Amino acid sequence: MVHATSPLLLLLLLSLALVAPGLSARKCSLTGEWDNNLGSIMTIGAVNDNGEFNGTYITAVADNPGNIKLSPLLGIQHKRACQPTFGFTVHWNFSESTSVFVGQCFVDRSGKEVLKTKWLQRLAVDDISDDWKATRVGYNNFTRQRTVEE
């Protein structure tokens, strides 16, 4: 027995076949310029084949805001995932402190890339008795800066 296939059913199947590839997870890329919820700006260069990258960071927040300088960062990410985890270190050029960030690069439901991070900042102290107050902990959410084309 042969059944006639409805043109509507064929149209539905064709539509699904064309739309389904676009529903797959979009890859999140660290490379580019980002700003965070505090107004800091980070630029990440190309990620090499080993997952390593470098860049710069200019913070919007500091104990002495008049001394803020562009500071280098160095990091690594897992390359295989569409939404990779990563970590990087910032060597602050204007203070005796270092920060480390860990996070994950996500593509949200609206298609925008977001870096969700947690950080530790180690301040230099003159005496071991001050060690208890030398490490700060926090979080930042970074979003990709708009480009001229957007």
UniProtKB/Swiss-Prot annotation:
Residues binding biotin, per UniProt: N36, S40, Y57, T59, D63, S95, S99, N140
Family (UniProt): Belongs to the avidin/streptavidin family.
GO terms for cellular component: extracellular region
Protein name: Avidin-related protein 6
Main localization of the protein described in the UniProt heading: secreted
Domain called Avidin-like: residue spans: 26-147
SUPFAM superfamilies: Avidin/streptavidin (SSF50876)
Organism: Gallus gallus (Chicken)
A matching Pfam family: Avidin
InterPro entries named in the record: Avidin, Avidin-like_CS, Avidin-like_sf, Avidin/str, Avidin/Streptavidin-rel
